[in-house]
Each structure stands twice: as structure tokens, then as C-alpha cells.
Amino acid sequence: GIVGDIESLPYLESLRQLRWELGSDNCLVIHLTLIPYLRAAKELKTKPTQHSVKELLNTGIQPDILVCRSEYPLTMDIRRKLALFCNVDVGSVIEAIDAETIYDVPLLMLKEKLDATVITKLRLKDRREPRLKAWKDFLGKLKNPTHGIRIGLVGKYNELQDAYKSIHESFVHAGAVNECNVDVVPIHSEQLEGSDEEIRERLQDLHGVLVAPGFGERGIEGKIRAIRYVREQQIPFFGICLGMQCAVIEVARHVAGLEQAASTEVDPATDHPIIDLMPEQKNITKLGGTMRLGAYDCELRRRSKAAKAYATLKISERHRHRYEFNNAYKAQLEKAGMVFSGINPQTELVEIIELKDHPWFLGTQFHPELKSTVENPHPLFVAFVHACTEYQKAKKDQ
């Protein structure tokens, strides 16, 4: 939102009171603003920022620093004008020019000396140089990939740009580690409910497929059919949460011979409830805020793909689900070639599944994308991207 929005008023009043209580030496107000460029006049306009600061002053808040979003560099004349009419130092007018990638922003802010300005205004003594070698190394690999791969993202919410934002960013992190540009191809799962030929046309040119998390019946069969195709074609597969559950159902139906296997979320009366509500969820009638949320421990099976990726046997991952694999079917699926490589030690809940006779087929009940960062890319995403590059090489050699 913006300063003038009525929804912002409680927060602005809280900020005003906080600044009064802490004192100006212990509190800093940084105002992010837009400097639009008028192409007809070929000039940057400062009036919106001047009015925005005026609105902020009406709430009792004087900004200390202006961070100015812009398509073009700010001239010194514009900086002086903003400083004069917004009542800040010229050095406190920070240019935030449009960047090639969001990961450029920290270095651009360093170039504008935003860090030094903040330290000076808060009268902090610690002026150590930031250690940005790892960040710069990441940017170098991100911008100079040695090759590229295409990974299909099969989901139900692809029309919403940020629905799978964490997954997209995890691929950015993992791609940089593998010096690889990951082209994520959105595929709506409902588009995979047609003929086998249509599925083949959509998936055959991909180097890997990730089946995304989700809820509800819509698009489930499309996900299951996509998983069957990649399993049979030996294409690397990664399933997250619902994606893992769909993988279990697919193997149960087409390998273990349990043709009616389903999740009770979709078919409560199924003869083979491969995926079922967790016991502690069955008596819950109010669904708001009652899922299995947060971090839980997981123990990995030795010599599994998961253990190789993590390089350890004990991990902790974040969750958001109600349904789980039904352990009553564990023996049958193990006979079908499924490996239960990650188990919660307290509840025996299945956290990770794999397939023996497949180059890289892995599903997780947890959400690995929620822990991936630039400096610590998630090991499963790194391993998956690596598997996709190996598949690409093998395909070229054929």
C-alpha cells in the first residue's frame, strides 16, 4: 500500500509512537517511494514523492532516508530537489534503479552507501566491511550459466504469478550451484487429463518435472498421470506435499496393483486409502489453524538419494498438511519398489519416498522450498537440478 491508504493509518500511528518512545537516535524511518519517468517529456518526476512525504508528515513522521525506485539514474539536481522539498540530507536520497534481478539489489544499495548512511544516523560504532564474497560468487554463477535445462512445474494455481514463488526461487538458488539456468515451465494439472498423446507432447521435451503442493480434488488426476509418464520414461521427478501423495497413489495403482488407491481427501469411501487423515486430525471439525504446521524431525535411510543429498541422516523440515501416507500399505509398496527413506522418529509418519529403479524419483511430505536461501540452497533442489542436467546429457548422447 501507500501512505495515503486508510489501511496504513494504524501502522503509521504505531510507528510515530515507537519513534517518540525510542528517540530519533534509536529509530530510523526509511521511506520507499517511486520516481516515475514520463516518456513524452523524457524526465523523472518528483511530485509524487513530495506529496507522499507531505502525507507522512501529516501523521507526525519525518522520514530520515528516501529510497527512490526509478527506471533511470537520479541526477544530482533531482537528488537536491528531493532533499530540499522532503527535508532530508542529499546523501539520504538513495537511488534504487530497476535491476536485472532482485539479487542485484544488495550490491546496488551498497554502491549507494545505504548501509553507511544508516550506521551514521543511528550513531553506531561498528563499521566493519560486509562480507559479500559468497553473494558475489552466487551472482556470478547466476548470470553466467554454462548450460540450461527445462523443468515442468505441474500445479493447480499457475495463473497466479506468486503462487509457487518459493519453488521458483529455490530453483534459482539450486541452478546457481549447478551453474545452470533453470527454465521453469508452468503446466496446469487439469491440462494433463486428456489423451496420453497430449501428455506426451507437454512433457517429452522436459528434463525434469516437479509436482507442486496443493489441496482439494481439482487437477489431482492430471498430476497422477504426469507422474506415471515421468516414472515410465525415467525423467527426474520431485513431488512436494500433495505431489508426494500423488506419487504414492500412482505407484500403488499402476505398479502395486491397487487400482482403486486414492486419498480420502478426494474419495472418502475408497477401498484403498493410501493417503489418509492423520489420526490427530480425524476429530477436528474446525479446520482453521489446525493443520500440522512447522518444523519436525526426520531420520533418513542410509544410502538413499535423500541421505546422499543431505549428507546427513538427521534433518528438520517445515510442514503444512493434514493428510499422510497410510502405513498399513507400507509393505505392499516396498514390494513394488518404493523406498521410504525419511521417517519422523516420534510418529513413524512417512516424510520422504523414493523409487529404487529410477534415476531420480523423490517426494517429500514437507516443504523444502521454505528453507532454501542464496547462501544455503536446499540440498534436495540442488540434487534434483543436478539429476535433470544428467538426464539432459544422457538424452543428448542417445
Stretches with model-predicted labels:
Residues 1-314, 319-357, 365-398:
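N-terminal beta1-alpha1 cap of cysteine-dependent amidohydrolase-like domains
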